[in-house]
Regions:
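Glycine-rich Rossmann NAD(P)(H)-binding loop
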Residues: 6, 146, 170-175, 202-210, ...
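Mid/C-terminal beta-alpha module of Rossmann-like enzyme folds, strongest
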Residues: 192-248, 281, 287-290, 294-298
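Conserved beta-loop-beta element that borders a ligand/cofactor-binding pocket
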Residues: 126-148
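Short-chain dehydrogenase/reductase
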Residues: 101-126, 151-155, 175-179, 209
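Substrate-binding strand-loop-helix patch
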Residues: 148, 176-183, 202-222, 264, ...
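NAD(P)-cofactor binding segment of oxidoreductase domains
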Residues: 57-103, 109, 113, 123-128
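N-terminal Rossmann NAD(P)H-binding glycine-rich loop of SDR-like oxidoreductase domains
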Residues: 3-22
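Alpha-helical substrate-binding/gating segment
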Residues: 158-168, 175-210
Length: 299
């Protein structure tokens, strides 16, 4: 297949481009500000200034990894020539935090006060796409992790483990987190392209969540380390020392499992993530968690 991937230089879009390039002809659309992956064809252009750049291409699939709002989708659709299937990577942030959980695809979407404009913009992008593209799919992942993850999430815990630090846990550490390995997401997009199911919107993610404590234990275990926990009172801002908001949610992924009944174990996914991290530390966008911990929590 001839596939267009938006982005292609960082984490989700880069992994996606390299994953599909193994067996397909892959083009990436980006502004050329970062290094390009080997084995892909780079189209260096702003998605908002496409002109006729893409008109000469006929893509079997468009994987829109970097669409964040209605304008992003509108401008890309307007710049494309003929194409087959359009897959838009949306987010769990489209579900209001006030709705009962687990969230299902049929549930009404709306503003989530935790995610704010990010979720609202994804909603507007989804609606424009479904109104203007006949063969489109939308996937809504929870927290993505795995190889090439440049966000300071598991990488932060890995560094705590490397330095034999105690880990500072929000409250009692029982808040649950739902993850999805980036390779599993690519596998599912591949299934959508191959099987073309009638359903158009899918929640994706691991069928089971983990508590904060369980997640940290898994990260330390990846390095063969045992963690020591320190529990932090709720009056201290959680994002000052921990990579996730104080917000627990869960996506129902039964429809995904009907098409892809196995997902990668967290143990395996974290092992692959750490192997990448060790060789690509400079790629990670660090936050000042250590500074806050050392100044305000350890003292």
């Amino acid at each position: 297949m001839k596939i267009l991937v938006t982005g292609g230089t960082v984490f989700v879009s880069r992994f996606t481009a390299e994953y599909f390039a193994k067996n397909n002809e892959v083009y990436v659309l980006n502004r050329g500000t970062k290094s390009q992956s080997e084995g892909v064809h780079a189209i260096v252009c702003d998605r908002h200034e496409l002109g006729d750049t893409l008109k000469k291409h006929e893509f079997d699939a468009v994987l829109d990894i970097c669409g964040y709002n209605e304008t992003d989708v509108r401008d890309l659709l307007g710049g494309l020539g003929n194409f087959g299937t359009y897959i838009f990577v949306s987010s769990s942030a489209v579900y209001p935090e006030t709705r009962s959980q687990p969230f299902r695809e049929k549930d009404e979407i709306g503003e989530n006060k935790i995610w704010g404009d990010y979720g609202v913009n994804k909603i507007n992008a989804e609606r424009f796409l479904m109104a203007n593209c006949k063969n489109a799919y939308i996937i809504r992942p929870p927290y993505l992790y795995g190889k090439m993850n440049n966000l300071y999430r598991e990488a932060f815990v890995f560094e705590c483990a490397e330095q034999n630090r105690p880990f500072f846990v929000p409250r009692d550490g029982k808040m649950r987190l739902q993850f999805f390995d980036i390779e599993d997401m690519c596998r599912f997009m591949e299934i959508l392209l191959e099987q073309q199911p009638k359903q158009r919107v899918f929640n994706v993610g691991n069928p089971e969540s983990v508590s904060v404590i369980e997640w940290v234990e898994l990260c330390y275990k990846t390095l063969g380390k045992t963690q020591e926990f320190r529990f932090v009172e709720p009056n201290i801002e959680q994002r000052s020392y921990f990579p996730f908001y104080n917000y627990e949610y869960f996506l129902n992924v039964e429809k995904m499992l009907e098409l892809m009944n196995e997902t990668k174990s967290m143990e395996e996914g974290l092992k692959q993530s750490y192997a990448w991290f060790k060789d690509n530390r400079a790629e990670v966008r660090r936050k000042s968690y250590f500074e806050f911990i050392d100044k305000d929590l350890r003292g």
